[in-house]
């Protein structure tokens, strides 16, 4: 979920060649393709690098895969690399466009790289899409899932449903299920603000809409996470407020967010909690080197934990 796109970030985007048809195995090399997942639908998938585990980058609500290939840093944080190429330097990495998400183009636009889906989507259905995509594209598992914001909910639910295919988790200022009780009576207003964040696409029937409340329930009822290493990265600076969120609601969100982050840390023992000091919600843009380091840490821990 992002409500502002820095001009420098937009200018950094480059066009990517789309390849249709049956994909080759994505065990190495750079690929960018529309993958048939069945039911007359395809999803855009981009992969790079080689090695194991395969890292899967999951974007926040309403966001295409673009943020993982961009940076918006300030000294002393280096300008490059972005998370996607930075992770590709030491292992295989993939990311994809969910239907109805916003591209970081100029001007911003809904992605045309994945088949549109109308109506509100459930978290289990989105996890099913992801699993079908990885299977159809023959992306080698198991996977280290990196989820930003709402992407963290996808990562958690995927790990619950597919523990045998999950190697580790990195949660980047992720939206966790504990945010609901932390916000209490203000939760419904927050979810409504997520549904209508004040973008030019709010009224578009193909704009991504998700049953966030049902997603929280699915995770709460999904049982424990598999015994894999986890890292949590959290912001220290305020959210960029959407025009549809009141100052009072934003203040309550800021007060509740650290409690929900700490709950994520408590989901698995010995989970490192990394504070991206000076960063807002978009840790992967402002602190790509910290995000990459967290991915490498969990990749190393997962390798050490293998029998």
Residue ranges of model-derived segments:
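Flexible "cap/lid" loop of the alpha/beta hydrolase fold
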Residues: 170-208, 244
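Conserved loop-alpha-helix segment in the C-terminal half of the alpha/beta-hydrolase fold
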Residues: 245-277
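Conserved hydrolase catalytic core segment
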Residues: 137-178
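N-terminal cap/lid segment of alpha/beta-hydrolase-fold proteins
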Residues: 26-42
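Conserved acidic catalytic loop of the alpha/beta-hydrolase fold
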Residues: 124-142
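Conserved HGGG/HGGXW glycine-rich cap/lid loop of the alpha/beta-hydrolase fold
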Residues: 37-41, 46-106
């Amino acid at each position: 979920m992002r409500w502002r796109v820095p001009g420098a970030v937009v200018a950094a985007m480059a066009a990517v060649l789309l390849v249709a048809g049956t994909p080759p195995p994505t065990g190495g090399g750079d690929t960018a393709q529309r993958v048939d997942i069945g039911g007359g639908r395809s999803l855009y998938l981009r992969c790079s690098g080689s090695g194991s585990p395969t890292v899967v980058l999951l974007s926040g609500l309403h966001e295409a895969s673009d943020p993982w290939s961009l940076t918006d840093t300030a000294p002393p944080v280096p300008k490059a690399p972005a998370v996607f190429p930075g992770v590709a330097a030491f292992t295989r990495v993939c990311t994809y466009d969910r239907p109805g998400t916003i591209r970081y183009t100029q001007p911003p636009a809904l992605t045309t790289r994945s088949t549109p889906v109308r109506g509100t989507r459930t978290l289990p259905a989105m996890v099913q899409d992801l699993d079908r995509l990885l299977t159809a594209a023959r992306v080698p598992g198991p996977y280290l899932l990196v989820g930003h914001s709402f992407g963290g909910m996808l990562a958690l639910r995927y790990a619950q449903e597919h523990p045998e295919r999950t190697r580790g988790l990195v949660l980047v200022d992720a939206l966790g299920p504990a945010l609901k009780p932390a916000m209490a009576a203000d939760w419904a207003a927050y979810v409504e603000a997520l549904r209508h964040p004040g973008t030019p696409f709010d009224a578009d029937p193909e704009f991504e809409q998700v049953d966030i409340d049902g997603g929280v329930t699915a995770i709460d009822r999904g049982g424990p996470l598999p015994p894999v290493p986890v890292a949590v990265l959290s912001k220290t600076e305020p959210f960029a407020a959407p025009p549809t969120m009141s100052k009072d609601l934003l203040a309550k969100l800021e007060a509740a967010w650290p409690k929900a982050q700490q709950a994520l840390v408590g989901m698995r023992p010995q989970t490192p909690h990394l504070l991206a000091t000076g960063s807002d919600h978009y840790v992967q843009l402002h602190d790509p080197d910290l995000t990459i380091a967290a991915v490498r840490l969990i990749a190393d821990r997962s390798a050490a934990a293998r029998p």
